Every structure is written in structure tokens, then in C-alpha cells.
Amino acid sequence: MKKKNGGKKLNVLLTIKKIGINGEGIGYYKKKITFVKGALPDEVIVCEIVEETPKYIIGKLVKVKEPSPHRVEIKKEYSESGAYGLAHVSYEKQLEYKRNILLDAFDKYYRIPKPDKLVLKTLASPTTEHYRNKNQFPLAVRNGRVIAGL
């Protein structure tokens, strides 16, 4: 059962441990996994608890107390548009995070053993701003093999 925080603001201090498969920071509050959009691994943050379920918590980033060395300032219009999910991360670290997000998804949803041997390093784009693309590739396992369709 999902519950909102009943109008009460509860701000908590979290250390972010890793990036989730949707690009959100993951920390733990009272041993419960807590997702915080905009937070990065190794950061100490203050977040407001906005939703809690029996399995997880969603927090809203209030303040970064100890920023990641990979955090970069972004233009205000980027942060407001919602189109730049990892724009607050240095580009080199974005490439690493994106590969790790894919590896985590393969491991979590497809139980592919050692997927790191199947996924090459993320290729850098010559253009890192002012373009927009989105690719989605449906994947499935059939007869023990991964298949992709478009």
C-alpha cells in the first residue's frame, strides 16, 4: 500500500550508494531502499520523504551536503525540462553509469550470467548537448538466448 507523507515534511540525511536503473540515486533509510532523483553515488544529501511503500521509499532531493566529484552544474532550462536525466554528471561518468545501468538491468530482469562480457563500453557522442534521441529495444529470452525486436 502506497502512502503519501500525510502533509508532514520529513527530511532525512542519506548517503547515496549507487545509481538505479532509471538514473535515480539509491540510498537506505531505516534499512529500506530509497530512490532520490538527482542524487549521485557517494553523495551525502538531505531528502524529503514523499512516498513510502512496504518495499521502498521515494525521496525528493532537498540539498546536497557533500557533492560527488562527478557532479557538474547544469543550465537551469535543462533541469526544468526533465529531458536531461544525467546532465548533472560529468560526461565521462555518464558513459560509465549508463553502461552499469544496462548491466544491472540485464542482471535484475534477465539473470544473464556475467553480462559485462556482452556489453561493450558506452561510446561517446561527438555532440553532448542540443540533440535529442531516444531508443527503446524490447528484449526477451527465448530458448535460452536473448532476442531483440523493433
Task: Give a label for each model feature.
Residues 1-150:
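SAM-dependent transferase fold signal centered on methyltransferase-like domains
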